Structures are given as C-alpha cells and as structure tokens.
Amino acid sequence: LETSRQIIRQMYANREAFLLLLTKSQGSRFENCLDEVVDISEQQYRRLCDMVTNATGRPRVDDYMTHWMAHIMVDTFVHLFLHETEERVALKHVDALTMYLVRGWMGIMTES
C-alpha cells in the first residue's frame, strides 16, 4: 500500500509534468510513455507469476492475462490522477484501489 501512496505523491508533486506526459505528449518522443510503463510492469508481473508457478506447481498465468493486468494497474493510477485534482482525495482512495488490484492478482495466480 505504501508504494501506491508514494506513486500518487510523486505524481501530484510533479503534477504539471505528469499532465503534459499524459495529455499533451502526442507527437513527441514521450507519446508512448504509458506503453513503456506497461511493458516494464508486465515484465515484472511475468517474473512474479513464474516464481509463483515454480514455487507452487500451479499452471502458468498466460501472457495475455499478464499484459492485461499490467495495463489495468497502470490505467488505475492514470485514471485516479486525471480525475482527482486534489492529492488528498487520490490518497483517500488509492489503498482500496490497490487492494482491489492485489486481490485480483491473487485470484488469478491461485486459480490458474
């Protein structure tokens, strides 16, 4: 949960830069920055899922699902940031959103 709060704090501490990246970067070298964050997240999730598979013997979570879960995670933070103008409001909601994401991951990794 603390990592999610830190992400929100950093986004709001650099609000103008994040707004430019998220809403005005088309045509610049930064226009695919969200896809790059998703790719990094997807690689991390792939490693995590493979570790769970190796440790438990459960079936491997497929790449399609890993990709979508990475997208959902990134999109959650972007949506919260773009729709809440005040950091305190975003911080009020980020824990519940993070727990929702974590529980979804746990469900996928334990039911695959």
What spans do the regions from the language model cover?
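Well-ordered, non-membrane alpha-helical segments in soluble/globular domains
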Residues: 2, 38, 95-99
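Amphipathic alpha-helical packing segments from all-alpha helical-bundle domains
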Residues: 3-16, 28-53, 64-71
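C-terminal peripheral helix-coil segments that are non-catalytic and often amphipathic
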Residues: 13, 43-50, 66-112
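Short, hydrophobic secondary-structure boundary micro-motifs
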Residues: 19-21
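Residue-level recognition of alpha-helical structural elements
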Residues: 26, 30, 58-62, 86-94
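Residue-identity detector for glycine
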Residues: 27, 35, 57, 104-107
